[in-house]
Curated annotation (Swiss-Prot):
Disulfide bonds: none annotated. Keywords: Metal-binding, Nickel, Zinc. This is Hydrogenase maturation factor HypA. GO terms for molecular function: nickel cation binding; zinc ion binding. The lineage of its organism: Archaea, Methanobacteriati, Methanobacteriota, Stenosarchaea group, Methanomicrobia. The gene is hypA.
Length: 137
């Protein structure tokens, strides 16, 4: 379960960032997670909430925005992969990965390569500070 080690890194970054900005509470953490990151959002959320117990992030909502895989080709084409095929499977099976890896460019027909969809980025951390009664990002 590599979600635990990922959650540890996210929690540490959230904690350091929140403390650096004088936070009294972390309200929301928004992540951008690539569909090809091999990370289970539910397991990641569970691990994060477990790590956050007793901290300023204890009540934080972990919001995961899924990022679709994208292709690039040497001809200049950039685009997303057919989402219908990906939605059919909740898991990244070897068959689905083989399909994605072998995709041809819809413009020139050459084999394209995966350019995005593997990322895991902290997009935003919404905090509350003692000096302000309103939240800030």
């Amino acid at each position: 379960m590599h979600e635990l080690s990922i959650a540890c890194e996210i929690f540490e970054q959230v904690k350091v960032t929140a403390e650096a900005h004088g936070a009294t509470e972390v309200k929301h953490v928004t992540l951008q997670m690539g569909r090809l990151s091999h990370t289970n959002p539910e397991q990641l959320s569970f691990c994060f909430k477990t790590l956050a117990e007793g901290s300023i992030a204890e009540n934080a909502d972990l919001i995961v925005e899924m990022v679709p895989p994208t292709l690039e080709c040497e001809c200049g084409y950039t685009g997303t992969i057919d989402q219908e095929r990906i939605r059919e499977s909740n898991e990244l099976t070897s068959e689905l990965l083989a399909y994605i890896a072998a995709m041809d460019c819809p413009v020139c027909g050459k084999q394209a390569h995966i350019a995005g969809g593997r990322e895991l980025i902290i997009k935003s951390i919404e905090i509350e500070t003692e000096n302000e009664n309103e939240s800030q990002r």
